[in-house]
Each structure stands twice: as C-alpha cells, then as structure tokens.
Amino acid sequence: MMKRLGLGLVAGVVLGALAAPASADTITAIELSAYYGGANGTLNGDWSNEIGGASIITAPTSGNQNTGITFTDWSGHYVAVPSASMNDGSNALTIDNFSPITLTAGATVQSLWNEFYGLIPNSADNNAAVLITFTNSAGDSAAYGLQSGQTIRDYNNATFYDTLVGSNTTTALGDVTAQNWWNNGSQGQRLDEQSFVLPSSWAGTSLTGFTIDVVGTGDGNGNGSGAAGAAALSAVNVADPPASVPEPASLTLLAAGVIGLGAARRRRG
C-alpha cells in the first residue's frame, strides 16, 4: 500500500507539471463566533475547558493529519447543539448569519463535527444522530445525516462511539464522507472532518443557511445526555477543470510530423 501511494504522489506531481495550470478551488469560511456557547449549561463552547483541551487548541498548527484541509475560522471554540434528552427545550440550531455563497457544480461544505457524551442513533431518522439541512437562494433544501461510529464520533476516546468508518451505511443520509482531521495521539482526543457534497443542480444559486438538529439521544452508556459540537465550517466551490492546452513539446512533435508528411508527399510527386 505504501508503494502504491508513493507512485500515486509521483504521478500526480508529473502530471501537474505537464498539464496547464488548474483553477484553484474557492474556499469560504463560515464564521461561527456568533454561535459559540454551550448547551443547557453543561458545555461552554471553549475547547480549553474540555478533556485534553490544552492540546486541542493547538490544532491549527498540529492538525490536518495529511488531509490538506484547513479551516481559517478555527479559534479553539465550538458551537454545541444539545440532544433532546438534555431537556433545554431546544435541540436544533440554524446558522444563517453569513453572506450568501455562490455555488458551483460539485460544491461541498466541510465541517469539524464531534459528539459529546456519545449519541444513540435515532431509528426514526434512518439511524442518524445528527441531521443537517442546507438551504439555497432558490428556496431548495438538501438534508444529510451523520451516523454515530460512521461519520461522527465522540471527541474523546473513552467509552462512547470511538470508530469512524468514513461514510454512512445508510445511503438515504446523503453524500457524506468523514476522516480524522486532528488527534493528539495516545492522549485520546480528536477532531473529525466531514464533507457534504451539495446537489449539482444548485450550481448558480447561493448557500444561504443550514440547520443542525441533534436527533440522537442519550449515549452509549445510557447516561441520558448528549450533544454535537461544530468547531469550524467552510464552503468549498470546486473549480472547473481547465481546457486541455498542448504543451510546447507536443507542438514540436506535431510540427515535425506535419513537415515529414509534406516531405513524403513531395517525394511521391
């Protein structure tokens, strides 16, 4: 596997050097500071106060885990959304205080979501623990789900959901992938990145907001409390691939072929 990966990296460098420069993807940070805070008094929205917090707040410099994904709005804080079992009267949050983001085909939203105290999946919602619904300027909505142990897990490696498969086993929960973005090794804390692929039909519209609804309840040990926390969010517009442009070496070979063909015709004539 290591040899194959190395070959892939080398091939990518070579192809990148020969191909015409590609347009860069556009990344827009979605500011979360207006929503920092806790859920029902149990979470205050500051990673430094959580287990392993002193190392978690170093994620801007020690994170990424070779994912190549950065979050410019990372600040060591998070937005906590409670589960219904925390009994604070609300378990959903709408974030829409950002300027509309014009979308291209293939646009994605990237996030850092993790659980607190674990969340038992809700069978009434296709076994999702968290539902996230995006809306656009045309009034359309697209719903996605995060499954505990599949695309979301507890931030603390303890007795809750500690696996991260990387995709949902339930396809009805949308095109979502997940990967580890940062961890502090044997200390046991981590932050995980999710990518939501927005509908291609949304190209030309703008992302205007989204709602997070924590439908999972309790935790894997029946402690009766749970929440999900977002540390950072970004919208990524995937750039269109550039038109193929012949390289100078290719043009030279083409010219040589044309000259040779002309000489052959003159000899036959």
Where are these regions (language model features)?
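A short, hydrophobic C-terminal helix/tail in secreted or cell-surface proteins
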Residues: P246-A264
